[in-house]
Amino acid sequence: MININCDLGEGTNNENIIMPLINSCNIACGGHAGDFKSMTKCVELSINHNNKIGAHPSFPDKKNFGRKTLKISKDDLSKSLIKQISSLEKIIIQLGSKLHHIKAHGALYNDMYHDRILSEIYLDSISKYKDQCYLYIP
C-alpha cells in the first residue's frame, strides 16, 4: 500500500482540496503554525476522508515557521512538544478519532538527524505515545 502524506494546517487554507488526494496528514499543532480552529478543521476533514491523523510538532517558532534551529532549553522544548501534541490529541479524541502518528516539522525534523541530544529530548518528550502511534522520523 502507498501512503500519500501531507503537512496541513499551516495557513495555506487548501485542506479542502488536498484532503481527498491523500491517505494521511501531519497537522501543525501550534509550534510553527496552527491553532485550535485550524487543527479542528483539519481533524474534521481527515475524519470525513478516512485519513490517518498525525501531529506535526516543531520548535516553538511561528516567526520563522519552524525553519530555523532554535536554541532552547531541554525543559522548554519538552514542554512545548508535549503541549503541541496534547492540544491536537484533545481535538482528535473529542471528534471521535485517534492519533495515528507523529512527525516533527522543519528544523526540528532536520536537526534531529545530526543531533543525538536533540533526538533524545524529542523521543523522551513523546514517549507517552510510543505504544499508541507511529513515529515518522528522518
State where each predicted segment sits.
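Acidic (Asp/Glu)-rich catalytic clusters
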Residues: N16-I22, K41-G54, I93-G96
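Active-site-proximal loop/turn and secondary-structure-junction residues that shape catalytic pockets
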Residues: L8-E10, G31, F59-D61, K103-L108
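Catalytic beta/alpha-barrel core
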Residues: I27-H32, D111-M112, K130-P138
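Charged helix-capping and loop-helix junction motifs
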Residues: D115-I121
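Hydrophobic faces of well-ordered beta-strands that scaffold small-molecule active sites
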Residues: I2-C6, C25-I27, I53-P57, H100-A104, ...
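Glycine-rich nucleotide/cofactor/substrate-binding loop typically near the N-terminus or early
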Residues: L8, L45-I47, N51-F65, T69-L70
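Glycine/small-residue-rich loop that forms an oxyanion/phosphate-binding "nest" at active or ligand-binding sites
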Residues: K62-A104
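A short alpha/beta connector and helix-capping loop motif
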Residues: T12-M39
